[in-house]
Amino acid sequence: GTVDATSLVALFGEEAVCAETTAEGCVLFPAAEQWAAQVNEAMVGGRCEGMAVMAQRLFSNSASLIDLDPAAKTTFALSKDDSDVVDAIDFWWTTQMFVPVQEAYIAFHEYQPSEVAKELAAGIASGKDYTLAIYSDEGSGHSITPFAVVFNGKTYAISVYDNNYPGTVQQIVVDPETERWSYAAGATTPGAPTDGWSGGKSTIDLTPMAARAVPTSAPFTDSATKGSTRGNISNLLVTSADADTIVGVALTIDGKIYDTTDRKTVLPDGIYSRPLLGAGLSGNGSSVIVDRDRVPAFEADGVARARDTNETRDDAAYTMSIDSDGTPRVTVRTSTGPREDDRSTFRADTEGGVEVAPPPGHEADVNMANGYNNFNAPVPDGGSFN
């Protein structure tokens, strides 16, 4: 990815990200630098979220082709190798990390598919713009751009632009009777092979473009709420540079393990997980919000699945970070491994403390960032850091 100091200033404001500003530009706070590195790592899984947002911005005239390429008359004339185009896509891809975007996901997580369709229809009628996300049973997701909804008396047809199939109009069909949606992705002619899939409640959601307004509160700052209206929260972010791997978080709460890479997992109250949206049904990471008023203590381990088989992996390199209210940002780089009951990558206690311990058979590199302070420490196999 191409997220840098300039991007971060536009996303969160100079005061939140720049430790100082020199003749050469913004010198990032350590936490901002760590966050940007992790976000760029996650983009190896694709940039569909950024393309879906940019498509909506161009469609609604919130962005102009002339800002991307003065010579371009249509979006088809834009080059994927143009740095301005790449930077814009990466910039808007990053907004899925915003707490307001995550909170929109949380709200729509409780909607039935027909309720999502109705909300979208009403929003479009009132001039609101959205991106739409769909999720697979394998724990990954894809972002597309909706622009119309039609109800034929039996089903809703949501017309979308899918950046995987440029130049065509695709449709998501929602059946209110069964509360199921289906998407024959790529079907441009009847009977043609497709990459279609389907789902029910909690597998389709909307993000209002208003939730992506910039600048916003940074998730890595020392502010009291880090941009959340939910109050006392911890943000967990897990990413991987391995394009063949899907990574998430295994949370242990009151002795029970919840695997966020398994869409069938029913998460407890106070836990909200969203896969990062990449290319197709892919993406290299997950974002998890923990409401610490409901879940005061927990343990977190990185978990990885092979993208082609969905089998768990015990050798996948990953990066996981935790941002909690009023405490330093902690980032660990290690690899997945077998769990042991007395060891967790992150062990967050009721007092706001975090203990870091790599999985058995692995080492870890730990970074702690707080304001101007930045501390790095290697943790050997069998060791811990707090």
Residue ranges of model-derived segments:
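Active-site-adjacent structural segments surrounding the nucleophilic cysteine of cysteine proteases
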Residues: 1-82
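Non-catalytic ligand/cofactor/substrate-binding and regulatory segments of enzyme domains
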Residues: 1-17, 185-223
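Short, solvent-exposed linear motifs at loop/edge-of-secondary-structure regions
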Residues: 36-61, 143, 147-150, 243-259
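Extended, compositionally biased low-complexity polar/Lys-Gly-rich tracts
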Residues: 42-55, 87-103, 216, 249-251, ...
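Conserved active-site-adjacent core of cysteine acyl-enzyme catalytic domains
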Residues: 54-55, 59-141, 163
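Short helix-loop boundary/capping segments
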Residues: 105-140, 144-153, 161, 172, ...
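Active-site signature of cysteine proteases
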Residues: 137-210
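Extracellular glycoprotein-like low-complexity segments
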Residues: 218-386
